[in-house]
Design a protein with these regions (language model features):
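Intrinsically disordered, low-complexity segments enriched in serine, threonine, and glycine
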Residues: 162-232
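Buried hydrophobic-core signal for structured, non-transmembrane domains
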Residues: 49-55, 98, 114-118, 170-174
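Short acidic, flexible loop segments centered on an aromatic residue
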Residues: 57-74, 176-192
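Beta-sheet-dominated interaction scaffolds and their linkers
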Residues: 30-53, 153-163
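N-terminal signal peptide c-region/cleavage motif recognized by signal peptidases
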Residues: 24-26
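Intrinsically disordered, low-complexity Pro/Gly/Ser/Thr-rich segments with frequent PxxP/GP/PP motifs
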Residues: 73-105, 190-215
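Terminal connector regions
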Residues: 103-151, 157, 162, 214-232
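N-terminal secretory signal peptides that target proteins for export/translocation
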Residues: 1-9
Length: 232
C-alpha cells in the first residue's frame, strides 16, 4: 500500500528532526564548554573575582561571549566582565575576570543578585561555509551574589532561619536573613513542592495542594553548589 504524506506529516517530521538535532547539539556543546562554578559569590571587599571557562572538546573551536545581567534580566554595567569576547581552542582553559564597578551603590545590609551569561558559539569549518548548516549557540547562565561585608550572620546560618506561613493552597516562605536562600527538595508531608529562591528580607509564595498536610522539609544550595542537610 502506498502512503501519501500530507504537508502536516512532513512538517511534523521536520519538527521532530529539528528538536532531535537541537538536543544532540546542546548536549555536545554543554559537555564541550564548561564553567568552573555553578554560582559566583562576589565579596564586596574584593576588586575582582575569577571564573574559569574550559573547552573540553579537542577538535572544536568556540567563540566565547560573556556579559552580566541584573535581577531583572537586563544587561548591567555595575560589573565589568573581561574579556567579553574571545576565541577558545580545543582542550584549553581561559579565565573570566568580573570587576566591581558599582561605586558602593548597592545595598550594604543584604545580598544583591546578578546573572553571569557565557555564550559558546561553535566556529564554522571552511568547507561548511557554503552548506546549509545549523549552528546553535549555547548560553550558560549562573547566579552571582554580591555579598556585602559585615553582614549580621554567617551564610551557613540562614537556612534554619527560614519561616513558613500557609493560607489555603498558598505557602509563603519568609526569609528574615540578609542572604538569598535557594530552596530545593521541598516537601509537605510526602508531597513535593516547587523549588524556589527567597530574596533577603523578603518572601516568596508557592502553590500547595489544598488537601496536603504534614510538616515542611527542605534542603538549600550553599555557596559551592552543594546541598545542605535536610531541615524539618
Amino acid at each position: 500500500m502506498q502512503t501519501t504524506r500530507t504537508p502536516y506529516s512532513v512538517s511534523f517530521m521536520a519538527t521532530v528532526l529539528l528538536l532531535f538535532l537541537f538536543a544532540c547539539h546542546s548536549t555536545i556543546a554543554n559537555a564541550a564548554v564548561a564553567l568552573g562554578a555553578t554560582r559566583v559569590i562576589y565579596p564586596a571587599n574584593q576588586k575582582q573575582v575569577l571564573l574559569p571557562v574550559t573547552n573540553n572538546d579537542p577538535a572544536s573551536v568556540y567563540l566565547i561571549q560573556s556579559w552580566i545581567e541584573n535581577a531583572g534580566d537586563q544587561k548591567d554595567t555595575q560589573f565589568v566582565i573581561t574579556p567579553p569576547l574571545f576565541s577558545m581552542q580545543g582542550k584549553k582553559e581561559n579565565t573570566l575576570r568580573i570587576i566591581n564597578a558599582t561605586n558602593h551603590q548597592l545595598p550594604s545590609d543584604r545580598e544583591s543578585l546578578f546573572w553571569v551569561n557565557v555564550k559558546a558559539i561553535p566556529a564554522m569549518e571552511k568547507d561548511q561555509k557554503n552548506e546549509n548548516t545549523l549552528q546553535l549557540a549555547i548560553i550558560s547562565r549562573i547566579k552571582m551574589f554580591y555579598r556585602p561585608t559585615h553582614l549580621a550572620m554567617a551564610p551557613e546560618e540562614a537556612p534554619a532561619m527560614l519561616r513558613f506561613r500557609r493560607s489555603g493552597s498558598i505557602l509563603t516562605l519568609i526569609n528574615p536573613t540578609p542572604y538569598f536562600i535557594t530552596v530545593t527538595n521541598m516537601k509537605a508531608g510526602n508531597s513535593n513542592l516547587p523549588n524556589t529562591m527567597v530574596p533577603p528580607k523578603g518572601e516568596v509564595s508557592v502553590d500547595i495542594p489544598h488537601a496536603v498536610t504534614g510538616d515542611i522539609s527542605f534542603q538549600t544550595i550553599n555557596d559551592y553548589g552543594a546541598l545542605t542537610p535536610l531541615i524539618r
